[in-house]
Design a protein with these regions (language model features):
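Extracytoplasmic
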Residues: 23-57, 75-78, 162-163
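Cytosolic juxtamembrane N-terminal segment immediately preceding the first transmembrane helix
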Residues: 1-31, 35-36
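Small-residue-rich segments within alpha-helical transmembrane domains of MFS-like 12-TM solute carriers
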Residues: 36, 40, 122-130, 156, ...
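Helix-loop-helix hairpin linking two adjacent transmembrane segments in secondary transporters
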Residues: 151-202
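Conserved MFS/SLC helix-loop-helix module at the cytosolic interface between two early adjacent transmembrane helices
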Residues: 73-112
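Hydrophobic core of transmembrane alpha-helices in multi-pass small-molecule transporters
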Residues: 33, 101, 112-127
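Short hydrophobic/small-residue motifs within alpha-helical transmembrane segments
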Residues: 67-72, 156-157
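Intracellular juxtamembrane helix-capping segments at the cytosolic ends
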Residues: 127-140, 147
Length: 206
């Protein structure tokens, strides 16, 4: 009961629906589009991976299945971490995991290596989906529904954006080169955004 009262007091003390709230929305939307790349890149490069490891489509589809396993686990596990530590630390950690997974995939010599890495990519994608929606709800009151809907749409915008971009990269590069480019893009965009998101509501709850 006391925790509930304390949390309500903290939320009402935030300047909701302000310019800072909308800025946070833009940052979370951007990181949602970029950070969920792991759910979509594997779909585009799957034919190239089939050729690389001499496997059929059925076996290659396990890559997407393991991504979804990671996504499901991530929404639960990372959500609990964010409740305790706030949004910034998990975003920095999962960005590091995401970038490392892409770079490690480049030097992978066995198909099962990629399966494990896709679990981590799925977990990272989850960090920038459900928890981000929960976070932005604390910074809006009048436009809360709209704000949450915009953050939710980031994953689907990513589904339209990334396959087109990756397909164009694959026309000139192999899948490993594309993964390296993705790693650089994620690191360049997401680490700075994590810095600007440091004033998360959970960090202010004592």
């Amino acid at each position: 009961m006391l925790d509930s009262i304390k949390n309500r007091h903290t939320i009402t003390s935030i300047e909701q629906d302000s310019l800072k709230s909308w800025l946070r929305l833009i940052l979370l939307f951007t990181i949602g589009v970029v950070g969920t790349v792991g759910m979509w890149s594997v779909v585009v490069v799957m034919p190239a991976i089939e050729t690389e490891f001499n496997i059929d489509r059925g076996k290659a589809s396990l890559l997407y299945a393991t991504t979804m396993v990671g996504f499901g686990l991530g929404n639960f596990l990372i959500g609990k971490v964010i409740d305790r530590f706030g949004l910034t630390i998990p975003i920095i950690f999962e960005t590091f995991i995401l970038v490392s997974s892409y770079l490690t995939a480049i030097i992978s010599t066995e198909f099962w290596h990629l399966l494990i890495l896709q679990i981590f990519m799925g977990t990272a994608a989850a960090t920038f989906f459900g928890p981000a929606m929960a976070d932005i709800g604390n910074f809006f009151e009048k436009r809360r529904g709209l704000a949450v809907a915009i953050i939710a749409s980031a994953n689907y915008v990513a589904g339209a954006f990334w396959p087109l971009l990756i397909s164009s990269f694959l026309e000139l590069n192999n899948w490993k080169d594309v993964y390296f480019i993705i790693a650089i893009i994620c690191a360049t965009i997401m680490f700075p955004i994590a810095y600007f998101l440091k004033n998360n509501i959970a960090n202010n709850i004592s």
